[in-house]
A protein has these predicted regions:
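Long, mid-chain structured domain cores
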Residues: 1-3
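Short, charged surface segments at domain edges that flank catalytic/cofactor-binding sites
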Residues: 5-49
Length: 98
């Protein structure tokens, strides 16, 4: 009936708003995706070149090239591997380190 259809439309619009929100984008960052990006980037920081091969205990993080806070999405082409030092200094700036 029309009431159910209207409720469904409201439900879908809320889901779309969430998926575009910062929280929605961060929720898309799964451990599987993090691992995939690190493997793609050969476990190497795209900024300074530090790698776990040279520094076995190096903390690597996945960074949004265009920050979520500036409209960036959690997609493979907007993600890169950075060491913790480079990621902290980058913050939410848009810096192309590739």
């Amino acid at each position: 009936d029309i009431d159910n259809l209207n409720r469904f439309v409201v439900y879908l619009s809320e889901k779309i708003k969430f998926s575009k929100s910062v929280a929605g984008q961060r929720a898309l960052m799964t451990s599987k995706l993090r691992q995939h990006i690190k493997e793609r980037d050969h476990f190497t920081c795209k900024c300074c070149g530090a790698s776990i091969e040279a520094e076995p205990h190096l903390l690597l993080e996945i960074d949004h090239i265009i920050p979520v806070s500036k409209g960036g999405l959690t997609t493979e082409d907007n993600l890169q591997t950075l060491c913790w030092r480079c990621n902290r200094s980058k913050g939410n700036k848009v810096v192309d380190v590739q």
